[in-house]
């Protein structure tokens, strides 16, 4: 696992004890709810990672941070199942708690392989309709890293004051 970072999309445990993959057609199709890595994390992740987990948007920020820190990010959620044991619909957050903006979010789509596949990465930047995939996504995130600093610090401040 050295230099790898697994981001897992959750499987919801339903009231009848069945599991449902949390990848609906339109909503939250790119969520990551659990992470597996071999410590220590890169210094950049520790320095910039001062935000609360569980806030809307934090999962995309974690993927972005891992990517710009040089880790190989992948999501083998079709074979590694992170079970979500939260049957209540109650949440302590809403849309206004969303952290950041697209420039500091990345997504890694689920698959059935336990190996790095850059084609599963997506980065939205600038206008939300601009997207890059694969190696281009990694390169764009690295190219825009310093220009995105203001977005990053705004997201951290917002997280800490809500």
Protein language model regions, located:
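Conserved catalytic core of nucleotide-sugar-dependent glycosyltransferases
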Residues: 1-64
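C-terminal catalytic/acceptor-binding lobe
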Residues: 51-162
